[in-house]
Amino acid sequence: MPLLPSTVGLAGLLFWAGQAVNALIMPNATPAPAQPESTAMRLLSGLEVPRYRRKRHISVRDMNALLDYHNHIRASVYPPAANMEYMVWDKRLARAAEAWATQCIWAHGPSQLMRYVGQNLSIHSGQYRSVVDLMKSWSEEKWHYLFPAPRDCNPHCPWRCDGPTCSHYTQMVWASSNRLGCAIHTCSSISVWGNTWHRAAYLVCNYAIKGNWIGESPYKMGKPCSSCPPSYQGSCNSNMCFKGLKSNKFTWF
């Protein structure tokens, strides 16, 4: 099942406005067939930053902000989602994101991991108030995305996006992408589409299970939590399939 194709489009113009600029989904539109999740976990373990070099490139505050913002977007999708899963932090995904971010390469990667893991990228030159500022443009793509009606998915769902790209948003709200791991690294120098940026904040977010498959919609439309996977045993919180305590508090932005 191929991934959604990517187009650079107008995203690069955001640089001149002083805003966060976003990379797109990997241009390779024909990945290898799905492999067992254990394969991805072995790759994640092999791609971690060596312990002697390890310095966490994300604070607990930023980690919570990234996770809470994603869950806020997932809980408030329209049309409502019947099978949206609550997203949790995954240390292995975060370490893989850290290993990639520290290389300061403005591209999706590493290539061997992209077969199994979704990824969103953002880069910002200058000051920013919150890590949320680095990913707001991802969620704002929802204004350009038209969710396919069930009658249009016969059997494959059409891809409808009237903007430069919508695939950052669809990865954020892909129902089964219930694990997130991100890293932020300040690159002293990084080449972004032919321009050299200095002291740029580089955000890498990895997602599992990988989303953005052609012919599939991000989630199943319907009453919230009405089609949760059996593993959730009917537990629901804030419009999402939820395995934790129902008293869990979320911080919305």
UniProtKB/Swiss-Prot annotation:
What is its subcellular localisation? Secreted
Q: What is the phylogenetic placement of the source species in the record?
A: Eukaryota, Metazoa, Chordata, Craniata, Vertebrata
* Protein name per Swiss-Prot or TrEMBL: Peptidase inhibitor R3HDML
Q: Name one GO molecular function term.
A: peptidase inhibitor activity
Do the record's keywords include Secreted?
yes
Propeptide residues per the UniProt entry: 25-56
Which SMART domains does the entry link to?
SCP (SM00198)
Q: Which family does it belong to?
A: Belongs to the CRISP family.
Q: Which UniProt keywords apply?
A: Glycoprotein, Protease inhibitor, Secreted, Signal
Q: Which residues are glycosylated?
A: 120
From the UniProt annotation, give the residues forming the signal peptide: 1-24
Boundaries of every SCP domain copy? 67-207
Is Signal included in the keywords of this UniProt record? yes
Q: What exactly does this protein do?
A: Putative serine protease inhibitor.
Give a Gene Ontology cellular component term annotated to this protein: extracellular space
Recorded superkingdom = Eukaryota
